[in-house]
Regions:
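Hydrophobic faces of well-ordered beta-strands that scaffold small-molecule active sites
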Residues: 11-15, 40-42, 89-93, 118-120, ...
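N-terminal small/glycine-rich loop or linker at the start of catalytic domains
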Residues: 2-20, 53-59, 80-92
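Catalytic cores of alpha/beta
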Residues: 22-33, 150-159, 202, 206-222
Length: 259
């Protein structure tokens, strides 16, 4: 599974699938990849996105009005995989859509589509045994969120359950671009380094090239989500072009090969 980071910092981008529609999402994803995204998180829209801030909430509402479903997201993943063989593809979802499809069926279809990993934002590692068995059976990488408030023993458990990379949440609260990174992020990465050799990606709040470069001084990758979704929201009619331009500005600061 190509969930490797070939430079430092690597760039993980998040998009809400179906905003403004699936066809445009495809163009956005391919534009981001062409501009230098290393991993793409394909966000499944959900009616109650409690972990997300207003930008992604609005995107989910727009996508749901288009009728976007988990099945459509997996079809999109298969299409993108045909065009981008070496880019990591991660499905980013709440648990409910996966349960509605069925965990086993979801994992089978996702693997067939060329998905590499899955992040279920509201599934605690302590309750993930059935999910993990299915993920491992279908050679998918389970990715879990690690928060600054997590005690060391829980970080260890999260790291042991994760494959591909560990997602370090830079701060508590919901998603959303911020002008300044939280000070907890670097400390959390140091704590994770003590319990895992997996790459660590930092997300929640990264919105510009300066923050992206800052994360690269202590983490393996940076996740940019709300800033991407906001770029889409502000550039109706030229979404793919605008995202490509934004990603290119970020990746221009990332030229150091990962070792």
């Amino acid at each position: 599974m190509p969930l490797f980071f070939y430079r430092k910092p690597a760039l993980v981008v998040y998009v809400t699938c179906g905003d403004p529609d699936i066809a445009t999402t495809r163009a956005i994803v391919l534009s981001a990849i062409e501009a230098g995204a290393d991993v793409v998180e394909l966000g499944v829209p959900f009616s109650d996105p409690v972990a997300d801030g207003p930008v992604i909430q609005r995107a989910s509402e727009r996508a749901l009005k288009q009728g976007t479903s988990l099945s459509q997201v997996l079809t999109l993943a298969a299409d993108v995989r045909q065009q981008a063989q070496s880019t990591g593809l991660v499905v980013f979802s709440y648990l409910n859509p996966i349960l509605r499809m069925g965990i086993e069926k979801f994992c089978k279809v996702a693997r067939h589509a060329g998905v590499d990993g899955v992040l279920v934002t509201d599934l605690p590692v302590e309750e993930a045994d059935e999910y993990l068995r299915a993920m491992h059976a279908h050679d998918l990488a389970p990715i879990f969120l690690a928060a600054p408030t997590s005690p060391d023993e829980r970080l260890r458990r999260i790291a042991q359950a994760s494959r591909g990379f560990v997602y370090a949440v830079s701060r508590t609260g919901v998603t959303g671009a911020r002008q300044k990174l939280a000070g907890d992020a670097e400390q959390l990465v140091r704590r994770l380094r003590r319990v895992t050799k997996l790459p660590v990606a930092v997300g929640f709040g990264i919105s510009n090239a300066e923050q992206f470069a800052e994360v690269g001084t202590f983490a393996d990758a940076a996740v940019v989500g709300s800033a991407i979704v906001e770029t889409i929201e502000r550039n109706r009619g030229r979404e793919a072009e605008a995202v490509g331009e934004f990603v290119a500005k970020l990746t221009a600061t990332s030229c150091q090969p990962s070792v």
